[in-house]
């Protein structure tokens, strides 16, 4: 059976991604000084304006406007003709402390308050909710092919802009890849869409030729492209006005780009700007860690795990898996293995993945999962041999 599946990515200059990167840059700056800080940092951008807001409890000081400007500069918005300038944009901040009602449940989990003997790492979940982790063996990064290819294109767009190969490119951009599957295996790419911001002096014909040569052919395997592959490069015909001048941006608006490109389910919680007591982030990372190690151990060709929490409670309220008919053992047996090999209490996740570190800014563009260019703890295949003992 043949079917098509499509996923998109965006470059670091996309307005929503600017916000994610500022929020995580603030988190990293705080964690560099105070690893036990509580951070929920949200950012909004529009023409000439950055607003950073949220709840932060810490014993250190960081210069948030400076962090925002440096982040914007590193992305590439460093001159007025781009429609957004790190030097001249206004930066407003409005920060409160974390609610004491929330803090009391995170500081001491329900189990601890009830007198259960638990280890010191068992802090309560910072919120209720369900998180999903996914992995598939269809690519070397254990990610679905459509989102993996879309990220390769968006990273390459930024690379050729920053290294001067295509100096007329500007920071904003989006990519999209449609993959054709046969019998659940990716066999070819049916369509590629690239929209990239550019200077007014360049022709559409040059953009199309350059992106085909320096972006698409540079990162997409030739065997996946054929005479029937369709290419849509700047299909509107012009993309000069972009970034925050073209669209307002908000933290947490690219959660599907951040995860599995829609191929796996999503619990709805965003990642950027949140310290790891927020299970929206830490439990989603842990769920990916679980799923990837299970697939690497040969338990299934693809696997999704859902974990759910109650606010102020350490132990998950539920864990369930779906192997989409590819499992070598039953789903119930897989859940039993998860409970034996992994500790999914928030404090244990923070401990085992060493999450109280300034490692988050680098994840805020081009996806949080399948990052072969980064050393991320939730991508480590360090539980495979232990899992195999139970097979």
UniProtKB/Swiss-Prot annotation:
For this chain, one GO molecular function annotation is: methionine adenosyltransferase activity
Could you list this entry's UniProt keywords, alphabetically sorted. Answer: ATP-binding, Cytoplasm, Magnesium, Metal-binding, Nucleotide-binding, One-carbon metabolism, Potassium, Transferase
Q: Which residues bind ATP?
A: 14, 172-174, 238-239, 247, 253-254, 270, 274
Instruction: Give the cofactor note.
Output: Binds 2 divalent ions per subunit. Binds 1 potassium ion per subunit.
Q: Write out the pathway annotation from the protein's UniProt entry.
A: Amino-acid biosynthesis; S-adenosyl-L-methionine biosynthesis; S-adenosyl-L-methionine from L-methionine: step 1/1
Positions with a binding annotation for L-methionine:
55, 98, 247, 278
CDD domains assigned: S-AdoMet_synt
A Gene Ontology annotation in the biological process aspect, one of them, is:
one-carbon metabolic process
The cross-references to Pfam families, in alphabetical order and at most eight, read: S-AdoMet_synt_C, S-AdoMet_synt_M, S-AdoMet_synt_N
Which Gene Ontology cellular-component terms appear in the entry? cytoplasm
Role description: Catalyzes the formation of S-adenosylmethionine (AdoMet) from methionine and ATP. The overall synthetic reaction is composed of two sequential steps, AdoMet formation and the subsequent tripolyphosphate hydrolysis which occurs prior to release of AdoMet from the enzyme.
Oligomeric state and interaction partners are given as: Homotetramer; dimer of dimers.
What is the similarity comment for this entry? Answer: Belongs to the AdoMet synthase family.
Recorded protein name is: S-adenosylmethionine synthase
Species in which this protein is naturally found: Clostridium perfringens (strain SM101 / Type A)
